[in-house]
Amino acid sequence: SGGLDTSYTVMYLAKEKGYEVYAACANTGGFSAEQLKQNEENAYKLGAKEYVTLDVTREYYDKSIRYMVYGNVLRNNCYPISVSSERIFQAMAIARYANEIGASAIAHGSTGAGNDQIRFDMTFLVMAPGVEIITLTRDGNLTRQEEVDYLNKNGYFADFTKLKYSYNVGLWGTSICGGEILDSTQGLPECAYLKHATKEGPELLKLGFEKGELKSVNGKKYEDPIEAIQVVEEIGAAYGIGRDCHVGDTIIGIKGRVGFEAAAPMLIIGAHRFLEKYTL
């Protein structure tokens, strides 16, 4: 993703282990063209031999998001499973790429705290059997500060102003981990969110659906529902819509708490649910 954990992983494997590192970013709709370009530049600075963007946004929408809209899916009536729904598509894309280049190992930046590590590991075991799985952050129980110190020591400096938070950004929302999220009595401050609430006052938003898929926003038709989702996200995020914290169970037997901002999913699912009341 180009975040702290994966940046550390690229540099450490290239510099300390002498690996030939192929950096791959599986984009599920959360990166702009500028961000992807920056990811590429950073990957080479960190020591990667090659960098590639694997765009799985279309596959993610076609095989997951549209079905979550059909089903008005909210985990515990709260969380639109923004991250967990996209991980399998990221993992499959990485596994396919690893097989394509004949990689002997696949590294990912998951910690030992939640379900993501299981999603990645199991997918790689199934789709790339025999390939070694490397998880430096998890296996070394590394702190974020330790990773920053290592990168700085080796001449790599980046904007880690939100050091205590870990983000995952996709078409169906952004997750925020760390900081206040680790304390069940606290919520996230405004500065923790990537998209800031800047608008006040009412605004009328009209969403149009065809066979369960979002096809128009405020009267403007979109052939591609992905584009329509992005428009709704921009409108809703400016009001701070879709912010919350979710507490769920993990397969490793502990509770997990995650903050999120998901304006588009909350608005789209809410509108679709009420539309069904009138039409079904």
Where are the regions a protein language model picked out?
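Nucleotide-activated chemistry modules centered on ATP-dependent adenylation/adenylyltransferase
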Residues: 4-280
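Beta1/beta-strand and adjacent pyrophosphate-binding region of the FAD-binding site
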Residues: 1
